[in-house]
Amino acid sequence: MHHQHHSHVLQLDIQGTPQAWISLEHAALHVATDSVAWVDGDGPLATLRGGFNVARGKQSIIDVHPIMALHGASRVNLFDVVPAISKLKLFRRDRMTCAYCGQRFQERDLQCEHAVPQSRGGRWTWMNLVTACCVCNGRKSDRTPEEAGMPLLYLPYVPSRFEDFLLEGRHIRADVHDWLASRLPKGSRLS
């Protein structure tokens, strides 16, 4: 099977809520078992060819689209879902910008910064973490932004499900990126 650069399919529930990134093979299985409700995207991501049906003299062909919604109930309750945090997703949420000086930096020059320091019970959560450059993080030290006289230039927030799928930063096809971006909440930093 020939794999293209963009080899993952965005799996949705029937309402169009992102559920997972799945492989071409996994997506083809959904197509073959008729569990796909609808598809989207600018044409197939891949066309997979199988064996020949002797009775009909035809080869089996499965078109796998980059976005596919499956029949059945959603496995994800949106109100229970808090996206997993990673350093890179945090930096992308904050647009690689220090929350204290407002400068943009390369990933290697950024740190995850606890607004409320860990020593004071500050947790590793979306609402307590911001992106900081090494200099500002060192200057703020083990203090709150108020104590350090370093007010936050932007507020932390929990990314929506659509934002989270963009923040994962896979090599997303342009049509899939646009589909997700068109569903971002109003005021999203990612739009």
Task: Give residue ranges: language-model regions.
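Short helix-coil boundary/hinge micro-motifs
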Residues: M1-V82, K87, M150-S191
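A generic structural motif
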Residues: Q15, R123, C136-N137
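Secondary-structure junction/capping motif
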Residues: I22-S23, S86, C98, P117, ...
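Short cysteine-rich loop/turn motifs with clustered Cys
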Residues: V82-L110, V130-C136
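Histidine-centered nuclease catalytic patch
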Residues: Q103-T131, K140-P156
